[in-house]
Amino acid sequence: MPRRKDIYMIIGIMGAMPDEVDQLCEKLENVTVEPYGGVEYHRGTLAGKQVVVCCAGMGKANAAATTQVLITRYGAEKIIFSGIAGNMTSKIGIGDVVIGKTVLYHDAQLDMICQNPPYLKAYAGDPALIAAAEKACAEAGVKALTGKIATGDLFVGDSETKAAIEAKCAPDCVEMEGAAVSQIAAKNDVPCVILRAMSDNADEDGHEVLVVKKFSIAEYVATATRIVAAMVEAL
């Protein structure tokens, strides 16, 4: 099915959890909502640009499927994914942001995955989207690191798993969707960037940090909404 085209560029904006996209949905104007494949797609305008905002659900399969729907059904020509992640570096702390310059899987055999389109072991964030994210973070007063994001289908919450991932690919943070989004975007030649705020340190305290709300999802979401809205306005 050919990608649907509209008069103006359409930007796809994704999160894995409802909290990560709800505030953005509230900011949309001229909104229509379409349930499709178990996901609600909110189409409208943000900062005068046409966007489609959705909650993909957690994990690689959900992320990949939703990315393809955004591109094929809604004609998304740029993809922004925003969410939380486990910190893997001493360069930043809880609440700081990693902008994905490089995104890859930590739980996959990369030399096999790269035998199919887009023939890559790792996926590069789009330079223009990275620049827009860096500018938006700076203007919002948010400390940001442009670096490496690792993706796998597990919540990393113990030192042994964290050390194994560090030894394998030395990422700046670890999460569950970014590489899948980036792989499908690359396969379709669609520019993409992954933004992650650090919610925990990917160790034994990670689950407690999230459960007892030491890291405020609401606070991050408000900041992320400002960052994404500023990015959209700049595109």
Model-predicted segments: where are they?
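Short, conserved "active-site rim" segments that organize catalytic pockets and cofactor/ligand binding
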Residues: 9-28, 50
